[in-house]
Amino acid sequence: MNKLTLKSCLARTDELGVEIVGDVSYRGECNKEDGELATLHQKITFNFPEYAHLAFHVPNEFTADKSKGNAKFAHIAKRKAKGVKNGMCDYVVLPIRLGAPPFLCEMKRRDISLSLKTAKNKLHYLEQIELLASQKQHGAIAFVSLGADYAYQKFIEYVEKWK
């Protein structure tokens, strides 16, 4: 396998037809993904309370305590058995009406290079976009957003089209 780079990750995203909303060339200070997710959730639930019960973050990140040894593997196996999907996007809005697609957002930092700093981050990202591409092929609105503002704008467009 070739060495993973930011450029190769972005090229793969494009090949799979997964949209990135935001400026991929931006480099600079920005909020972390968790802050962006909280901002997106607050904007959606405050401005669209009628959809608040349909909108949620998928908490599928897991950092094991190295002192626990094999507990990490047991925890991962248990999560997998319960249907936790590795690579699932960060934010989901279930269909806002009958016939509307789900809204699936993978949140990255405004400076995407900060989200994809390590080889491990890049591999995980490729797994995420493969899943997003599959979900998009099955009718979902599935994309990567560089910050909450872009995701929120995409949500407004989604509501205008599907309400």
Regions found by a protein language model. Name each.
Residues M1-K163:
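Catalytic phosphate/metal-binding cores of nucleic-acid and nucleotide-processing enzymes, i.e., regions
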